[in-house]
């Protein structure tokens, strides 16, 4: 029972973090996939490919952390509005009576300093934190997933990456919202 609650909370938390990163102006998906009932686990993910990945990881005997990591990598391929490896996030884990919080948010580059966004008068330079190289941070997602896996994962790391690699290599049918986003952004 405890594992079911942990899995539900972890994946719901991952979904909430991912949903918070989504573009507010993106159109909603055309239709939601049908709900699937289970007595063993629950997965709430806004992408059917990533949901299938989570289900497969659990079926192979992986735990909630394994499923969350594999899902995160899959969403980096199939649901780029919310999932990517170029950002960061947080993971709250409760497993075997132990609670942990993994902070893998983006970090400032090594050469960053507290005045890097100020002009010679000490005023904030408009849009410098939004546009250009100085607006970027050092991504933390992969390092955070790795840290969570090392402490709480049960399957080999390679098995968690394989579904995302397969999706990227073999392709997938993108959601209409992703097609529109790519066309509007890159055409």
Set out the residue ranges of the language-model regions.
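Noncatalytic scaffold domains of N-terminal-nucleophile
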Residues: 22-52, 56, 64-65, 69-187
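Bacterial N-terminal signal peptides that target proteins for export
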Residues: 1-10
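C-terminal motif of bacterial Sec signal peptides marking the signal peptidase cleavage site
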Residues: 17-20
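Repetitive helical segments and hydrophobic/amphipathic motifs
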Residues: 13-14
């Amino acid at each position: 029972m405890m594992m079911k609650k942990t899995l539900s909370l972890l994946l719901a938390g991952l979904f909430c973090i991912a949903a918070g990163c989504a573009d507010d102006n993106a159109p909603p998906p055309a239709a939601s996939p049908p709900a699937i009932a289970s007595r063993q686990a629950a997965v709430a993910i806004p992408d059917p490919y990533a949901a299938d990945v989570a289900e497969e990881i659990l079926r192979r005997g992986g735990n909630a952390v394994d499923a969350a990591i594999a899902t995160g990598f899959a969403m980096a391929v199939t649901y780029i509005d919310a999932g990517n490896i170029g950002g960061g996030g947080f993971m709250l884990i409760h497993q075997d009576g132990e609670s942990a919080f993994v902070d893998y948010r983006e970090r400032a580059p090594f050469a960053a300093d507290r005045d890097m966004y100020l002009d010679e008068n000490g005023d904030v330079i408009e849009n410098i934190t939004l546009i250009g190289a100085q607006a970027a941070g050092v991504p933390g997602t992969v390092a955070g997933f790795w840290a969570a896996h090392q402490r709480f994962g049960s399957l080999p790391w390679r098995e968690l990456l394989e579904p995302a690699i397969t999706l990227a290599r073999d392709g997938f049918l993108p959601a209409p919202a992703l097609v529109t986003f790519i066309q509007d952004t890159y055409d």
